[in-house]
């Protein structure tokens, strides 16, 4: 798959110590990067790395300075370079408020991938390494870390232009350090929470359960429908696609002469037409799982009352027919103790 880079620029953020205080500084490019095969390859790798990251959705609030500058650029009232420099200033101003503020290279790029226009923003770290030249001499060198990054956001410019009221045109990386990165990027962009994939997935699961219940399906029949739903969702996750509600409905049986999509709309679950899949939520369609107090359990839902029996009164599970490898471990270790 190819990527078409329209405009791209790099700016540098550095740190300095003034007295007892840390200060962030900027080194701004005065012109855009020339678009070369190397530049396009770098952006393709950044695009792919971003696709694989855990992301949250957001929308601009009414007072977003970033959105105002972006709109001026999109309306051709300013150039991309000018927009990028103002965005860098906003970023540094916001970043300086946080203890995790660090140096980095800021990448801003407008590109097209699969007929969709994007604006990508990321703060990349530099890594030190060694370089061997043509004379087999060793030199110190630095390279951009383009596979591992936590501070990044992307705007779907195509979706924003088609539907300004969309709640999913802006995404940002959640980050491994938790909520702080999320708050920081929300403040920098002047944004607030948009589509919540976790909530959407939970609503989808509830809709599927209710759809089966209103048709008075047996436990086995309901589980078969849920398994169909999971297989479709699993297929979408495997190819990096979202759950398409209409497409999902077409794979499910029609119950009480009403398709699932029609049922979900009628019952007002608030489901989006396209839902980002959340694996941890969807797996509950076919499995029971949990962990705590040194115990981790996971088993297929269809095994309830067949090989796995729950006694609510005694808060216990009885398992008949242990997995062979577990039984083998018990026999070897516990018999050895006796």
From Swiss-Prot:
InterPro entries: Nucleoid_associated_NdpA (IPR007358). Transmembrane segments: none annotated. The keyword Cytoplasm applies. Keywords: Cytoplasm. GO terms for molecular function: double-stranded DNA binding; single-stranded RNA binding. It is found in: Cytoplasm, Nucleoid. Its main location: cytoplasm. Pfam families: NA37. One of its GO terms (cellular component) is bacterial nucleoid. Belongs to the YejK family. NCBIfam families: PRK00378.1 (NF001557). This is Nucleoid-associated protein PM1885. It comes from Pasteurella multocida (strain Pm70).
